[in-house]
Regions:
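Amphipathic alpha-helical repeat scaffolds
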Residues: 18, 28-31, 44
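Hydrophobic residues in alpha-helical segments
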Residues: 20-21, 47-48, 85-88
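Helix-loop segments that flank and shape redox-cofactor active sites
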Residues: 41-54
Length: 123
């Protein structure tokens, strides 16, 4: 499986990733690191407590990583939670609505992770 094929499989934006990382080797390196990172675990922990500061911090970190890797759908989903808990911004969603959004993020992350794991196994 090529890096382009994994992006197609996971619904990522390969062209965007190339603009940022410049080389397939770099894209591959950081895409593979995503599967070993605790970035989604931190968001899960924050979701468990519904702590606004922890939710903002963990969602903001995940959004940045996903955006830089061209994982646009995942970055957009996480961005909504980031903005919901941005300090100084008023809440627009109920806790139940936030939990629904978080469940969608976790499902997208698991799908993305599975595609990356398949890519990793093909190396």
């Amino acid at each position: 499986m090529t890096i382009q094929e994994v992006y197609e499989k996971i619904g990522g934006n390969y062209d965007h990733a190339v603009q940022i990382m410049r080389m397939d080797k770099m894209i591959s390196k950081y895409l593979l690191k995503l599967t070993d990172s605790d970035i989604c675990d931190k968001l899960r922990e924050a979701a468990g407590s519904m702590d606004p500061a922890a939710l903002f911090e963990s969602a903001h970190a995940m959004k940045g990583v996903c955006a830089n890797l061209g994982l646009d759908d995942l970055a957009a989903a996480v961005s909504e939670v980031t903005e919901e808990f941005r300090p100084g911004s008023g809440r627009k969603l109920s806790d139940d609505e936030v939990k629904i959004r978080l469940d969608e993020i976790f499902a997208k992350f698991e799908t993305t992770k599975a595609g990356i794991e398949e890519y990793k196994a093909s190396l």
